[in-house]
Curated annotation (Swiss-Prot):
HAMAP family: Ribosomal_uS8_B (MF_01302_B). Part of the 30S ribosomal subunit. Contacts proteins S5 and S12. This is Small ribosomal subunit protein uS8. GO terms for molecular function: rRNA binding; structural constituent of ribosome. The keyword Cell inner membrane does not apply. Keywords: Ribonucleoprotein, Ribosomal protein, RNA-binding, rRNA-binding. GO terms for cellular component: ribonucleoprotein complex; ribosome. The gene is rpsH. Belongs to the universal ribosomal protein uS8 family. InterPro entries: Ribosomal_uS8 (IPR000630), Ribosomal_uS8_CS (IPR047863), Ribosomal_uS8_sf (IPR035987). The keyword Transport does not apply. It holds the Pfam family Ribosomal_S8. Transmembrane segments: none annotated.
Length: 132
């Protein structure tokens, strides 16, 4: 079966594993997914991730993070720009997620970054997703 939106699949797998308190989740890898996983790690939404070479495209193993009483660190994930409807934002129109409590992941000409970093560097781009 052909996958039309691999990033939405990536976010859905993380969301589903998070809802049932899985320790880790494995997804097919790509450069964009690795960049998003790196941002999630830097922002403290996941414990860690690792890339596993399998002779094809590789696998990305993501270790989810929970609080001391099994509180979910990731409350929600939402895909914004989809293959059928791309969403772009100029540098002064970058969205704030929950008044700054969440992050928006933006694909800019200088790579994939958070909305805060893109705002600081004065860059706009495609709004990939919101995470809070």
């Amino acid at each position: 079966m052909v996958m039309t939106d691999p990033i939405a699949d990536f976010l859905t797998r993380i969301r589903n594993a998070n809802m049932v308190y899985h320790e880790k989740v494995e997804v097919p890898s790509s450069k964009v997914k690795r960049a998003i996983a790196e941002i999630l790690k830097e922002e403290g939404f996941i414990k860690d991730y690792e890339y596993i070479e399998d002779g094809k495209q590789g696998i990305l193993r993501i270790f989810l993070k929970y609080g001391p009483n099994k509180e979910r660190v990731i409350s929600g994930l939402k895909r914004i720009s989809k293959p059928g409807l791309r969403v772009y934002a100029k540098k002064d129109e970058l969205p704030r997620v929950l008044g700054g409590l969440g992050i928006a992941i933006i694909s800019t000409p200088k790579g994939i970054m958070t909305d805060k970093k893109a705002r600081k560097e004065g860059l706009g781009g495609e709004v990939i997703c919101y995470i809070w």
